[in-house]
C-alpha cells in the first residue's frame, strides 16, 4: 500500500473524528438551549395567573369590568390550552431533531420556541397587569360605595338617636333621607346594567346629599333648642319677673311690654314653622334677632332694678345733704350780715348766697317729697334716679360754692389786721428812709427821689384813710396794701441807688485829682460832673460822667471803687 493512500485514509479518519466531535458539541449546546426553554416554559406556566383570575372573579364584576375580565380570562385559557401545547410539541420536535443530528432543523425549532415564549411572556404580563387594574378599580369602587353607605348609616343612626331634637324639621329630614335612599337604589340599578359612568355620578350625588344633610342635622338641634327651650324659658322668666316688679310698684318708661312679650312668642312660632325649609342661615339670623329683643327686656328690667337701689340710697342721702346745705347757708348769711356792718363786701358773696337759696328751695319744693316717698311715686325708678342724681349734684355744687364764699369772707378781719400792721411798719420805714437821706449830708435831694418819696407817702395816707372809715372796703384795703408794699420796696431800692451814686461820685472826683493836671479830658469831665453833683443834684449823671473819663485813663478803676463801696455800704436800720 502506497504512502499516499495511507495518508488519505488517515485524513478521512481524522475528518470523521472531527465531524463527530463537532456534532457532539452542537448537540450538547442544543440540549442546553432546549432545557433552558423547557424551564422557561415551566416558569411561565407556573405563574399564579389562575389564582389572580379566581381572586378577580370573586369580586363579582359587572358591566364593562366584567366584559374586560372575560376577554383577559379567555386569553389566558387560549395560552394554556393552545399556545403552551404548541410550544411543548415544538420542544419535543427540537429534541428529536437534535438527537438525530439534524442540527439545522433543530436550531429552527429552538428559535421558533424562543419566539413563542417571548410572545407568551408579553401576553402573561399584559394579562396580569389588566387583572391588577381590574382588581384595583373594583376595590376603589367598592371602597367608595362602602364609604357612602357608612356615611348614610351613621346619618340614620344619628337622626334616630336625636329624633326629639329636630322639632318641626323631622318630616323634611325623613323626606331628604328617602331621596338619598332612592339615589343609592338608582346607583345599584345603573351599575348592574353596565353603565358605570352614570352610576358613579349618581353615587357622587348620593354622597354629597348625605354629607350636606349630615351637616344640617348637626346644626338643627342648637337652633331647635333655642326655639323650644331657651327662648320660652327666658320669656317665662321675664313675664314672672315683670309681674313681681309690678307688684312691688315698679313703673316702666315703655307701656307696651305685654305686647312685646306676645310679639316675641309669635316670632318664635314663625321661626319654628319656617325651619322646616332647612334654611338654617335665615333661622339663625331670626334667632339672633329674637335674642336681642329678649335681652333688651332683660336690660330694661335690670336697669330699673339697679335704679331702685340707687334711688333707695340717694333718698336717704338727699334730705340730710339738703339740711346740711341749708344750715351752711344760714351760717354764711349770719356771717356776711355781721361782716357787712363793718366792711363793704363784694356783691358776689350776696349774689351767691341768693343763688344758693334758690337752688335749695327748688330742691326742697320739688325733690324732697319725691325722695321721702320714692317707693310711692308713679314714675320709673330710672327717671327718679336722674332727678335725685341731678339734685345731689346741685347740692354738691352749692356746697362747693359755699366753701368758696366762706374762704372769701373768713379772712376779711385778718386782712384788715394785717393791713394795719403793715401800715405801721411802712410809716416807720418812711421816716427811717427820710432820716437816712438826711444823715448823708448831700448837696440836695434828686427830684425823682422826692417824687417817689411823696408818692409813697400819699399811698400810705390813702391806706390809712381807708382803714379809718366807718365801713371798710376790704377789697380796696387789699389793693392799697399791695400798692404800699411795692411802693416802700421801690423807695428803699431808690434810696440805696441815690446814696451809692452820690458817695461813689465824691470818691471818684477826689481820685481824679491825680489826672486833672495833665489829662484835659479828665479835667473837663471833672468840671461837668461837679456841676451835675452840686448844682443839679443828678448823682447818677455825675457818676456816669466822671467814671467814664477815669476809665479812659485807668481801666477798671470804677469797678474797684464800686466793689469797695458795696462791702462797706451802710444799711437803713428799720
From Swiss-Prot:
Subcellular location per UniProt equals: Cell membrane
Q: Where are the transmembrane segments?
A: 8-26
Q: List the ranges whose topology is Cytoplasmic.
A: 27-574
What is an annotated GO biological process for this record, any one? division septum assembly
Report one GO cellular component: plasma membrane
Which ranges of the sequence are coiled-coil?
102-131, 161-190, 276-379, 459-493
Membrane topology term: Single-pass membrane protein
Record key words, sorted: Cell cycle, Cell division, Cell membrane, Coiled coil, Membrane, Septation, Transmembrane, Transmembrane helix
Stretches in topological domain Extracellular:
1-7
The record's InterPro entries line, in alphabetical order, gives: EzrA
Quote the function comment for this protein: Negative regulator of FtsZ ring formation; modulates the frequency and position of FtsZ ring formation. Inhibits FtsZ ring formation at polar sites. Interacts either with FtsZ or with one of its binding partners to promote depolymerization.
Question: So what family is this one in?
Answer: Belongs to the EzrA family.
Q: What is this protein called?
A: Septation ring formation regulator EzrA
Taxonomic lineage is: Bacteria, Bacillati, Bacillota, Bacilli, Lactobacillales
Gene name of the encoded protein: ezrA
